[in-house]
Amino acid sequence: MIDLFINIASFTIYGIPVIPLFIIVFVILSYYLLLLHDESPLWLEKENVYIDVKEGEQHQFPSLVENKNPIDNIYLSVIVPAYNEQIRLPSMLDDAIKFLNEKSKKDLKFSYEIIIIDDGSKDSTAKLVTSYIEKQPSSNIRLLKLKQNRGKGGAVKRGILCSRGKYCLMVDADGATEFKDFNRVEDIMHKIEKNDLGIVCGSRSHLVDSDLVAKRSFLRNILMYGFHIFVQTLCVKGIKDTQCGFKLFTRETARRIFPTLHIERWAFDVEILYLAQKLNIPIAEVAVNWTEIDGSKLDPFSSSIQMAKDIVRIRFRYLLGIWKIKS
């Protein structure tokens, strides 16, 4: 046995001892995945502000954390993260505004705001949003312009922390999910909501055997299934589709989860649902109409690597108490 250990210990690759090399790699990976502090500050200077077009003045966004109850009787806050979305955003906004205005006319108690988070775009996304604001009452649409790119999770977090509504609906800027599905998501929310807590996730799991998925590349489908198994194993149990960008939160749920959210890139949905399950917040999935839209910023291979690293962070940083779950 001792001789075997000596042989293993003396084994080398290109003259480099394997065991010391393994220890060094393990320490570096552990530091990078578990201990490295890699989060950006919540706000940069004069970042959490919007321009009131009617008044021509700059105002600070309200704080979700400091305001337990909805502000200005807003029922729904629609949160739209946008990075270089000047081409795809107009179709989504037109669909959303039409639906929301019609709903407001039918239900006088229904009111809404749309917060579009320009996540450090290099195109004319902010200019486009400003043109929509000028067409709409200034209280309906607000632009949160981040000075640097934070990632989808970082943009959504900051948008929700500025929201006024009783409910917060996260939607993608590409309009992949039909906005009319909000009615279905809202109905389920009213059924599961308990003590002002609840999350309803739009789900594409019913499309797994459809042509939409069949037409994807073999690599992309393999990565999709592998990611699902990885998430189920390490973090979130029982949710078929963690990544759909159509999610509804109660205000109290948002107040409990988003202030301490750490992941700012694509895997932030996993952290949201991981925390929700740990806090016993009711969660439901609802099938939504979904269409793949050209122009995605997601590179399947590199994004999968980033998401895998983030999922490891989520699991072990909370497990080791590096990140705290606040009730």
UniProtKB/Swiss-Prot annotation:
Q: Where does it localize?
A: Endoplasmic reticulum membrane
Q: Which GO terms describe its cellular component?
A: endoplasmic reticulum membrane
Q: What class of enzyme is it?
A: transferase
Gene3D superfamilies tied to this protein:
Spore Coat Polysaccharide Biosynthesis Protein SpsA, Chain A (3.90.550.10)
**What CDD domains does this protein's entry cite?**
DPG_synthase
Q: Which UniProt keywords are present, listed alphabetically?
A: Endoplasmic reticulum, Glycosyltransferase, Membrane, Signal-anchor, Transferase, Transmembrane, Transmembrane helix
Task: Please give the Gene Ontology molecular function terms for this protein.
Answer: dolichyl-phosphate beta-glucosyltransferase activity
- A biological process from GO: protein N-linked glycosylation
Q: Which residues lie on this side of the membrane: Cytoplasmic?
A: 37-327
Reported induction:
Regulated by srfA.
Q: Does the keyword Iron apply?
A: no
Recorded hits in InterPro entries, A to Z, give:
DPG_synthase, Glyco_trans_2-like, Nucleotide-diphossugar_trans
TM region(s), chain numbering: 16-36
Which reactions is this enzyme annotated as catalysing? a di-trans,poly-cis-dolichyl phosphate + UDP-alpha-D-glucose = a di-trans,poly-cis-dolichyl beta-D-glucosyl phosphate + UDP
Family statement drawn from the similarity comment of this UniProt entry: Belongs to the glycosyltransferase 2 family.
What species is this protein from? Dictyostelium discoideum
Disulphide linkage map: none
The entry's function note states:
Endoplasmic reticulum membrane-bound UDP-glucose:dolichyl-phosphate glucosyltransferase involved in protein N-linked glycosylation.
- EC number of the protein: 2.4.1.117
How is it placed in the membrane, per its record? Answer: Single-pass membrane protein
The protein's gene is named: alg5
Name this polypeptide is given: Dolichyl-phosphate beta-glucosyltransferase
Principal subcellular localization? endoplasmic reticulum
Hey, which stretches end up on the Lumenal side? 1-15
The pathway it acts in is: Protein modification; protein glycosylation
